[in-house]
From Swiss-Prot:
It catalyses: 2 D-alanine + ATP = D-alanyl-D-alanine + ADP + phosphate + H(+). One of its GO terms (molecular function) is metal ion binding. This is D-alanine--D-alanine ligase. HAMAP family: Dala_Dala_lig. Mg(2+) 1 binds at residues 247, 260. Cell wall formation.
């Protein structure tokens, strides 16, 4: 345990979103890791805004995925209470969670991102299929539909609308599925994702053996550099901080297309962020403590 860091950590987990079960798995792994280093842990299952944090808990380790955890809500509540927490602030979390907003900012910042538009109410999509239809504010590939024939579009939009009233149509870019962890302003080794079949959906993300991963990804030096730079640029464009994960498709013509940023990436037994950290020489407990350290020092410096 680092004596310069708070001893008592409140781990906030659960939440009301579709990603609740993944959050509980992330929290369990984080709690076990920090406990093994000697930290005192208060595990708090957050179901409403009226959660209680022990008075002597000195910082919150946020493990809530999806709405209320990654959309800026819980960060804003903690900021009002004057309680330190891990990860990005409320504003950058909100931008990253809203795909329509973040992709608009990527375009303004010169970051490659697949063409997209908000759909519904009879709006015409200004590019041809295939499309990826997705809720603007949802994570873990929940609510995503693939459309290859325009006849399938209305049904796909209807399905995605179950998860958010704002739905995007995005051009389907084919290529290598990659993800890049960002930690303390630096890009971690790139991970390549190969689902055993189909696309990297919720099932392939959280089922052991459903996907194969390569870390570091088998890319050329130039490809690796371009992917890491693009990921870091995207992270900075949204004002994110401490840590996160950037999902990218590297197309056959060498363009790294940014799909989205996860400000509270999964930390489960199948998660990619810890895999990338391990490839850089950092075990899971060290990673959790590093996130704690960066977040706490940032809070002390800026509040």
């Amino acid at each position: 345990m680092n004596p310069a860091l708070p001893r008592h950590i409140a781990v906030l987990k659960g939440g009301p979103s579709e990603e609740r079960e993944i959050s509980l798995r992330t929290a369990k792994a984080v709690e076990d890791a920090l406990s093994s280093l000697g930290y005192e842990i208060s595990s708090i299952d957050v179901t409403t805004e009226k959660f209680e944090i022990p008075r002597d808990a000195e910082i919150c380790f946020l493990c809530i995925h999806g709405s209320f955890g990654e959309d800026g809500q819980i960060q804003r509540l903690l900021m009002r209470r004057g309680i330190p927490f891990t990860g990005s602030d409320a504003s950058s979390s909100e931008k990253a969670f809203d795909k329509a907003w973040s992709k608009t900012l990527f375009i303004k910042g010169g970051i490659p991102t697949p063409p997209f538009c908000v759909v519904g109410d009879g709006k015409k999509i200004p590019f041809d299929p295939p499309y990826v239809i997705k809720p603007s504010r949802q994570g873990s590939s929940i609510g995503i539909e693939f459309v290859y024939d325009i006849k399938e579009l209305d049904q796909a939009i209807k399905k995605s609308t179950q998860y958010d009233h704002v739905v995007l149509a995005e051009a389907l870019i084919t290529g290598k599925e990659l993800t890049v962890g960002i930690l303390d302003g630096k890009a971690l080794p790139v991970v390549e994702i190969k689902p055993k079949e189909g696309f990297y959906d919720y099932h392939h993300k959280y089922t052991k053996g459903a996907s194969t991963y390569f870390c570091p990804a088998p890319l050329t030096v130039d490809q690796t550099s371009a992917v890491q730079k693009t990921a870091l640029d995207a992270f900075n464009v949204l004002g994110c901080s401490v840590y996160g994960r950037v999902d990218i498709i590297l197309s056959d013509n060498g363009i790294p297309w940014v799909l989205e940023i996860n400000t509270i990436p999964g930390m489960t037994e199948t998660s990619l962020f810890p895999m990338a950290a391990k490839a850089s020489g950092m075990n899971f407990a060290q990673l959790c403590e590093k996130i704690l350290e960066i977040s706490y020092l940032r809070w002390k410096a800026h509040g």
